[in-house]
Amino acid sequence: MAKETGTAKPARQKKEPQPLVIPKNATDEQRLKLERLMRNPDKPATVPERPKEWSPRSAPEFVRDVMGSSAGAGSGEFHVYRHLRRREYQRQEFLDGMSEKQRLDEEYKKKLIQNKMLEEERTAKRRLKRQKLKEKKKMCKKGKKEEKKEDKDGHTDPENSAESSDKSDLEDQ
């Protein structure tokens, strides 16, 4: 048996048993992650890097031996040709995909701008309508106040009526 040494190891702190919590939705999952991070705020949180977009190997700038698709019997050159051809097709497919993606992005941006312009036009039209209604209500209130004023006086002043007609003419313009 092994000999016991006089130095004893310090007792390890036991972690509190955590109940198993299964997140039911995204907010629960986010809350659990935040709670775990906040248990030890001194520990730095790791933010994963965004994965790099895949791109094919670049084509060689200079190819010394250009071989054809036909090869003699027992020749290993055909395999080299086949790999080069596959890589070139892959590169062309990637470039086609990138151009398609750019085209779709441009169309999307144009559509966003067009929708924004249409929305602004509709908003301006509705704003004008609201302003007209406001002015109409003000005119109705003014007209009622003037009628009440005339009723209280019992008679109409030719000077006041001329002034009110001048004001209404100015407002119509």
From Swiss-Prot:
Q: Name where it's found.
A: Nucleus; Nucleus, Nucleolus
Parts forming coiled coils: 99-150
Q: Which UniProt keywords apply?
A: Coiled coil, mRNA processing, mRNA splicing, Nucleus, Spliceosome
Q: Where is this region: Disordered?
A: 1-59, 117-173
Kindly list the GO CC terms recorded for this protein: nucleolus; spliceosomal complex
Gene Ontology biological process terms, A to Z = mRNA processing; RNA splicing
User: Organism's domain of life?
Assistant: Eukaryota
Q: Where is the composition biased (Basic residues)?
A: 124-143
The biased composition feature labelled Basic and acidic residues covers 26-42, 144-173
Required for nuclear localization, as annotated region? 125-137
Decide whether keyword Nucleotide-binding is in the record. no
According to the record, the residues making up region (Required for RNA-binding) are 50-142
Q: Which GO terms describe its molecular function?
A: double-stranded RNA binding; protein kinase binding; protein kinase inhibitor activity
Keyword flag Membrane: no
- Quaternary structure (record): Component of the pre-catalytic and post-catalytic spliceosome complexes.
Purpose of the protein: Required for pre-mRNA splicing as component of the spliceosome. Binds double-stranded RNA.
Q: Tell me its family.
A: Belongs to the PRKRIP1 family.
The name of this protein is PRKR-interacting protein 1 homolog
Which organism's genome codes for this protein? Xenopus laevis (African clawed frog)
The opening ranks of the lineage are: Eukaryota, Metazoa, Chordata, Craniata, Vertebrata
